[in-house]
Curated annotation (Swiss-Prot):
Name of the featured protein: Conidiogenone synthase
Naturally occurring in which organism (per UniProt): Penicillium roqueforti (strain FM164)
Residues holding substrate: D97, R190, I191, V192, D193, N234, S238, W239, D240, K241, E242, R328, Y329
Cofactor(s) the protein requires to work: Mg(2+)
Region listing for Disordered, in residue ranges: 701-724
Length: 742
């Protein structure tokens, strides 16, 4: 497989493009994807999405009229169904790199990467008011589109890839202030700074290549050599452009380039330093070939590793031939982006769009049929009730000073509600003043509910920290919570009378929903799934509907766009997922304690389903929950017993099936709402839905730390033989020089 992979989707490019060019001296033959038009389309689409159609071609990334698309050249065997996303992501990375490279001060650089990190992670977000400009809104949508699509196509890789992306953004803001005593020290960091590892992980996934942890470790030295070669080639061809930017900015734009490092550390002119970098490139390619042949000579070389090595060869050759005459580095007569847009039009390039089949609720998000759930019966309505239309009608009961608020507001947060506000503003275009009022009111209400929840549930931890009432006392915490409710109302009154009606309506829903939950837990009354979902619609869905209804009441466009059903289903998904994770997630154990819902005597969704399973006695479980109401903390052994009972009754599996059904319906409703909103795609909401999906819960692959590349560097250059003894890299370079002179 490793030797034939080039024949799947790749074809060789015309040798006339590079063979007679003295600047091309790679040992490898370049290929290009047969469907490179897909990569070209989405490269232009990224420009339109990010800056509008008039700005297409104002900056340069993938497209190269001379040799071809960067992604198509470096990943010529990318699976066609993944090529669009891979190329779109690389295009955005190019444009983001331009933003950071041109940042004339550290503060601007930090801001660019902070915004990217927040958009991907949807956490620690700054105020919504910082993201209401057209440019910021477009950028946020593009970032969310990328993240959501990876999570949709492959949740396990998507989570890993997004974490690797965050590592990349963090490294950029760190490395630019460092000095490097040698080229090897520089390359260790440059691999991450230039996103070489991140980009190749993307190409590997796109090409359908998977390595086990053991295979990854075997391939690491060869991967390092290839990554370093890619960085060196990039630095060599981009040197003139980067040096010009450095000079024009009077040194404010830093030089992060191998040519500069060699010149400084070895006391050479820039011309001589470029020659050294060229020699280093050849040395790394030679070393790659040597290590590859060594591996192929082992007893049973892995096809996966050989395929990965072939991809690395393609990437090295593709990067080189692309760099020969690319608009990013050199002036060209014609703009390939403008030419492509003129030839194909703006509609043709819109390749990366939401999946059309989601309009049919009977289909799964990934193209397979939806999980067939049992038709609801009179004694088991969980799966039908979960998609039922929301009906209001709760009676009123709302009672709403500042240290507990300051404390809980400082704790880490998933920022789901703030994310939702920013996302909905794509549709409603709420004035900034109103947007800030809504954001403040929702923040007050959310934190108020958390303070009261922790008291009412008897919680010990909140997000891994002590709960507020253990620090400030129960009385003060209650006083703060009620004060926050009043402050939220005070803010809402600044909007309009209709906004106040929305507030009071949803506060009724929220408080009665919470009251039902407390009543059931205290009296150990097991509700039906339908009753539970009705409670969730008030307790959790109320705040989501409050956001959507307040924003709709203040909207400047799409005032007839009602997303109450979407907000209600989002609340159901959020709460049922929280119930599941509390009993099954290691992260929840770390942040809240081991199955703390059991200590609280909370009758969560999996427990309700388990206690309604036919053929099982509930006597033991009921006794356990009655005991917890007397303040008895359950032992780990007792909790394990309960978990085993829930598992045996199939309640966890049924809960996951319900969550999956909600996930699919939320995505379908989102597409339906996007059409009603004039075709405005809301990728921030789509990303929020994807991040809430439990996925297949496969074991997540750990990302390498920066220091790991130093280890791989040593492994890559260890063991080369000359005259029967090991030699270091310097000797290896000298040996090459001697060989070239013979």
């Amino acid at each position: 497989m490793g030797e034939t992979i080039a024949d799947v989707y790749a074809e060789s490019i015309d040798p006339e493009i590079y063979a007679n060019n003295p600047a091309y001296s790679s040992l490898f033959t370049p290929y290009i994807h047969k469907q490179t038009i897909i990569a070209d389309h989405v490269s232009v689409q990224c420009h339109i999405d990010l800056n509008g159609i008039d700005a297409v071609g104002s900056k340069f990334g993938n497209l190269n009229a001379h040799a071809g698309n960067f992604t198509s050249l470096c990943a010529p065997n990318c699976l066609p169904e993944r090529l669009a996303l891979v190329a779109y992501t690389v295009e955005y990375a190019f444009l983001h790199d331009d933003e950071t490279d041109n940042a004339a001060d550290q503060e601007a650089l930090l801001l660019e990467n902070k915004m990217l990190h927040q958009a991907i992670n949807q956490s620690s977000m700054t105020s919504v008011s910082n993201r209401v400009s057209a440019k910021a809104q477009r950028k946020s949508e593009v970032q969310a589109k990328i993240a959501a699509e990876y999570l949709r196509l492959d949740p396990v890789f998507g989570e890993f890839f997004l974490k690797a992306w965050q590592t990349f953004t963090a490294s950029v803001q760190d490395v630019r202030s460092l000095e490097f005593p040698s080229l090897d020290d520089y390359l260790e960091f440059r691999i991450v700074d230039a996103a070489a590892d991140w980009t190749l992980y993307n190409f590997r996934w796109g090409s359908g290549i998977t390595l086990t942890p053991e295979e990854e470790k075997i391939a690491d030295p060869m991967s390092y050599v290839a990554y370093a070669e890619l960085c060196l080639v990039n630095d060599l061809f981009s040197w003139d452009k980067e040096y010009d930017a450095h000079v024009k900015s009077n040194g404010e734009v830093p030089l992060v380039n191998a040519v500069h490092i060699v010149a400084v550390t070895q006391g050479l002119t820039h011309c001589a330093a470029k020659a050294v970098v060229q020699a280093e490139i050849r040395a790394h390619e030679e070393r790659f070939c040597y290590l590859k042949e060594q591996y192929k000579a082992t007893a049973s070389p892995s096809d996966s590793i050989l395929s990965w090595l072939k991809l690395l060869e393609h990437s090295m050759a593709g990067n080189w031939v692309w760099s020969l005459c690319v608009p990013r580095y050199f002036k060209v007569e014609r703009n390939p982006y403008k030419d492509h847009l003129e030839k194909f039009g703006s509609e043709a390039v819109r390749v990366l769009t939401p999946e059309e089949h989601l309009r049919d609720s009977k289909q799964e998000i990934n193209g397979t049929k939806e999980i067939e759930l049992q038709e609801p019966k009179s004694n088991n309505t969980a799966e039908s009730d979960v998609l039922a239309k929301y009906t209001s009608g709760y009676p009123t009961i709302d009672e709403p000073v500042l240290n507990p608020y300051t404390y809980i507001n400082s704790l880490p947060s998933k920022n789901v509600r703030q994310t939702m506000i920013a996302a909905l503003n794509s549709w409603y275009k709420v004035p900034v003043k109103s947007l800030l009022i809504i954001e403040g009111a929702v923040n007050f209400l959310h934190n108020s509910s958390l303070l009261l929840d922790d008291i009412q549930d008897g919680s010990v931890l909140r997000r891994g920290r002590p709960v507020a009432h253990q620090i400030f006392g129960v009385g003060q915490t209650i006083n703060t919570a009620t004060y926050l409710m009043n402050e939220a109302l005070y803010l809402v009154q600044m909007l309009s009378p209709s906004a106040v009606l929305v507030y009071t309506d949803e506060m009724r829903n929220l408080q009665l929903g919470q009251g039902r939950d407390l009543h059931w837990s205290y009296h150990t009354h097991v509700p039906t799934p339908a009753q539970y979902i009705s409670m969730v619609d008030g307790k959790t869905g109320g705040l989501f509907r409050l956001i959507s209804r307040l924003m709709r009441s203040e909207a400047t466009v799409n005032r007839d766009l009602d997303i109450s059903q979407f907000a209600t289903l989002l609340g159901r998904h959020f709460q049922i997922r929280d119930d599941y994770q509390n009993l099954q997630s290691d992260d929840y154990t770390k942040n809240k304690g081991f199955c703390d819902d059991l200590d609280e005597g909370k009758l969560s969704f999996p427990i309700i389903l388990s206690m309604q399973s036919p053929g099982f006695s509930n006597t033991a479980l009921s006794s356990v929950f009655k005991g917890s109401q007397k303040g008895e903390t359950l032992s780990p052994e007792m909790k394990q017993y309960i978990l085993e009972e829930i598992t045996a009754r199939g309640a966890f599996s049924q809960t996951k099936a319900v969550l999956r059904k909600l996930h699919i319906e939320l995505l379908r409703l989102l597409m339906e709402t996007e059409q009603k909103a004039g075709g405005i795609e809301n990728w921030a909401l789509r990303l929020l839905i994807m991040k809430l999906d439990l996925g297949d819960e496969k074991k997540k692959e750990a990302h390498k730390s920066d220091s790991a590349w130093k280890v791989n560097q040593r492994r890559a250059w260890k063991g080369s033989q000359k005259n029967g003894r090991p030699i270091d890299k310097a000797c290896f370079l000298r040996a090459m020089e001697e060989a070239s002179q013979k």
